[in-house]
């Protein structure tokens, strides 16, 4: 598979290149603040950079008819509309978290909340001091799995890649469910799984859950 990275020189960009190269995939497109280096035609473009970069990413995907794996957070409606339009021409996977564990947790929460429907629920998320958006896209994703609005507490400290705790409470007992990303590698592994999934797919919007669970 030939692939491109938007945000190539960033921390996630470097992690993505490392994981993809270990699987023998060829990097043919590099995009960062210094410009664009085009070495070939990618099958898939991976972008974990910023919402501001999305117009250029969309332009490149259209140019090369390349699928898009998008892990950028803090997207606005205008960005989502760009993706909907792009998905008419190429396959797209967009997710706020490419950790397989988080997406398994999301599915689990959607079932658990049916049993604990009268319990209090709150979410606590912790990320590194450089993360700009709060609450995190992942916390919002987990809230959506609960099917209702719940309090979300955001901490920005040190170099934490990502901790999410969902707390259920009732009189006399609590349940805490925690997911911890130990390194950014987990997100790069998820991006790889999504990129390989997209190769040969028809145009359209695909969820990361479809990548993991198939058509279930």
From Swiss-Prot:
Question: Which enzyme class?
Answer: oxidoreductase
Q: Which PANTHER family match?
A: 4-HYDROXY-TETRAHYDRODIPICOLINATE REDUCTASE 1, CHLOROPLASTIC-RELATED, DIHYDRODIPICOLINATE REDUCTASE
* Database matches in PROSITE patterns: DAPB
Which residues of this protein are catalytic?
Answer: 127, 131
From the broadest rank down, the organism's phylogenetic lineage runs: Bacteria, Thermotogati, Thermotogota, Thermotogae, Thermotogales
The UniProt keyword set, sorted, is: Amino-acid biosynthesis, Cytoplasm, Diaminopimelate biosynthesis, Lysine biosynthesis, NAD, NADP, Oxidoreductase
Pathway as given in its UniProt record: Amino-acid biosynthesis; L-lysine biosynthesis via DAP pathway; (S)-tetrahydrodipicolinate from L-aspartate: step 4/4
Which protein family is it in? Belongs to the DapB family.
- Protein name, as recorded: 4-hydroxy-tetrahydrodipicolinate reductase
One of the entry's Gene Ontology molecular-function terms is: NAD binding
Q: Could you tell me which InterPro entries the record lists for this protein? A: DapB_C, DapB_N, DapB_N_CS, DHDPR_bac, NAD(P)-bd_dom_sf
Q: Name one Pfam family in it.
A: DapB_C
Q: Which residues bind NAD(+)?
A: 7-12, 71-73, 95-98
- Extract the Gene3D superfamilies matched here: Dihydrodipicolinate Reductase, domain 2, NAD(P)-binding Rossmann-like Domain
Write down the HAMAP family for this protein, in alphabetical order: DapB
Instruction: Output the superkingdom of the source species.
Output: Bacteria
């Amino acid at each position: 598979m030939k692939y491109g990275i938007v945000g190539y020189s960033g921390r996630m960009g470097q992690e993505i290149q490392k994981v993809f190269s270990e699987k023998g995939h060829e990097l043919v497109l590099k995009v960062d603040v210094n410009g664009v280096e085009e070495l070939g035609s990618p099958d898939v473009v991976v972008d974990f950079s910023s919402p501001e970069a999305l117009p250029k990413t969309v332009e490149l995907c259209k140019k090369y008819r390349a699928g898009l794996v998008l892990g950028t957070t803090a997207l606005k409606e205008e960005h989502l509309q760009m993706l909907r339009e792009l998905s008419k021409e190429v396959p797209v996977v967009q997710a706020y978290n490419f950790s397989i564990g988080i997406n398994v947790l999301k599915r689990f929460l959607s079932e658990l909340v049916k049993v604990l429907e009268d319990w209090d629920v709150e979410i606590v998320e912790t990320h590194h001091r450089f993360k700009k958006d709060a609450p995190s896209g992942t916390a919002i994703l987990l809230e959506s799995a609960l099917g209702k609005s719940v309090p979300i507490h955001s901490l920005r400290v040190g170099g934490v890649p990502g901790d999410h705790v969902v707390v259920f409470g009732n009189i006399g007992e609590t349940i805490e469910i925690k997911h911890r990303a130990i390194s950014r590698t987990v997100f790069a592994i998820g991006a790889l799984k999504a990129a390989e999934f997209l190769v040969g797919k028809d145009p359209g919007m695909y969820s990361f859950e479809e990548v993991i669970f198939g058509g279930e």
